[in-house]
Amino acid sequence: MTSAARKVSVLLGAQWGDEGKGKIIDFLIENHKINVTARCQGGNNAGHTVVANGRKYDFHILPSGIISPTCFNVIGNGVVVNLDAFFSELAHNGVLSEPGWEKRIMISSEAHLVFGVHSQVDGRQEDSLAAKNKIGTTNRGIGPTYSSKCFRNGIRVADLMADFEEFSEKYRRLVEHYKKQFPSIEVDVDGELARFKEHREKLAELKLVGDTVGFIHEQRTNGKQVLIEGANGALLDIDFGTYPYVTSSNSTVGGACTGLGVPPTAIGSVIGVVKAYQTRVGTGPFPTELFDADGEKLQSIGKEVGVTTGRKRRCGWIDLFLLRRSAMINGYTDIALTKLDILDTFPTIKVAVGYKLNGQTLTAPPAQTNAWGAVEVEYKEFEGWMEPTVGVRKYEDLPEKCRQYIQFIEEFIKVPIVYIGVGAERESLIVRQKQ
């Protein structure tokens, strides 16, 4: 690798997911000449919504750059790939009707495959937990697929593209492994294999599988701009999230390196996407969650319904104590603050600035699960601006009280807020110069 190779940018959700990453990625592709977008982790448990070209796109496993005719799209080795979902999503978003789409996407041969049996196991494992211990999984088989990867009986895309008899034997062994744990599982092995044979033929015909590590390094060497697109959110990271109520991969910046074969020294900027308030899907700790009219108002105005699950999102005030931790771990160089306009009609707005546990001020979030329930939140209160921000395109045109809110967040986490979302459309974005 030459020293002239271009640095990559990484975009991550800084909270519990659903921060509005798709909108920011879409803006960057259109305005910063992004040549390659790359997914590095997760699977079709993610959900990105992009509103562009007069229509709404929903992405779960596809990189958001797929809607741009000039952008190449990579699904990296760290992603777990459900091929049924992959082809279905291409059709649902109208990609298959675009000429030459297959020349703009590559799936890593080293990515692991998600099978129907993984989804069944996901559901069985969740059902076996007591109500208070349920994780709130999407039942897409993501966790069990990563478990197979670690157990070393996982099956990769390369296996599918090689000798099909060997692939079939590996698959049968995988099913038997799970049937020993869950005897009630019913799997149409022959039907599943027939479907994967069709997938194999389609992948080969369209030449969709390749060496994504080599491709990205080649693009960098040639001076192309690569944007790595994180899924889920930093507070759902398997190591640094609110364990065990987390996803099954590293959704922090380290996942960009391990999930694509990109060295840490190749990362030039890390953009953290932050919603102006806090949301969470499923179970797990949420110290600033609101159970009153304000919470219902955030849910209603913000249209807080999960793209992947269809579940209503839990809503609360933004948690700067957790956001500062997120910034510490990921080294954000820029922040994109989204959905600021949702707060336009709130006369009082709160932000969490600290935690106490048993009367003691905490310097870090609790590492022990049960401790979260006893956390006391320290808030700072702001007077709402009570003016519409939708349509504003310059930072100085925002209401003064709104700017005070933004400035406080910046100063608390010590990262500049460069992008401010004030509406769903692509153009509903304020771009600030770094101070």
UniProtKB/Swiss-Prot annotation:
Pfam family, one: Adenylsucc_synt
Protein name: Adenylosuccinate synthetase
Function: Plays an important role in the de novo pathway and in the salvage pathway of purine nucleotide biosynthesis. Catalyzes the first committed step in the biosynthesis of AMP from IMP.
UniProt-annotated binding residues for GTP: 17-23, 47-49, 313, 339-341, 421-423
Record keyword Magnesium present: yes
Similarity field: Belongs to the adenylosuccinate synthetase family.
CDD domains (alphabetical): AdSS
Enzyme Commission numbers on file: 6.3.4.4
Gene that encodes the chain: adss-1
